[in-house]
């Protein structure tokens, strides 16, 4: 396995040797029929292993299932190798039943740190969650949301009238962020994309690229009249008043890709699609 650090740098050989055991392969599948069939076939070949005691976990499904698996295994140190048995497979490798062990040993690894969201709801209740793709804020009613944006304690935009706003990681920059006309960020870049969703005022503001070390604070103006929900990947908190977002440096997940099809290569290719 070619092991890469969180910014695409190779890890020292001393750190690679302890991670080379990939004998115990666990399989997890989405509810898609194709994923369930693949699970049955691969477990007949390789056996049934508990994901929490495996050397590597193979996720069968699409990107949604891959994200769920990443959340389950965050900070366990167990590498995840996705094979596409779903509709969207940006984070997945091609599906094949043959030579799986050889593919795993030849795979390249990317380490990803999530964002941590701390949302304070009306009434004072707080809820935290992590996001590998993005944290997004979305209006709950027909009226536009009004949001104040602060970065590292400094107010950068006093009032943004919009349908919402999102903060995306390089991994998530090709997902919802791209659909909202945000920039694609190279994997390994020390950056985050702050992208408005259907901004009404200021109409010409197209977002910002900020350091991944930044602390972003989003305050909801007129929260009673213009309620807003915050979403970290798949977890939603409704009626928020403030949302604090920063990179979670204490947690990470390891993703495996076939040689020549690394996450960095996929992000680069995405920028030349029309």
Model regions: which residues?
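Catalytic core of DAGKc-family lipid kinases
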Residues: 88-164
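Proline-centered loop/turn at the N-terminus of a beta-strand
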Residues: 77-79
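ATP/NTP phosphate-donor binding region
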Residues: 2-4, 15-60, 66-75, 95-111, ...
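Short, low-complexity intrinsically disordered segments enriched in A/P/G/S/L with frequent Arg
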Residues: 5, 9-11
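ATP/nucleoside-binding phosphotransfer catalytic cores, i.e., glycine-rich phosphate-binding loops
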Residues: 129, 137, 142, 152-157, ...
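Short glycine-rich anion-binding loops that position phosphate/pyrophosphate groups of nucleotides
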Residues: 62-65, 86-88, 171-174
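A generic structural signal for short beta-strands and their flanking turns/coil linkers
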Residues: 56, 111-115, 131-133, 143-147, ...
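Gly/Ser/Thr-rich active-site loops/lids in small-molecule metabolic enzymes
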Residues: 159-162, 166-203
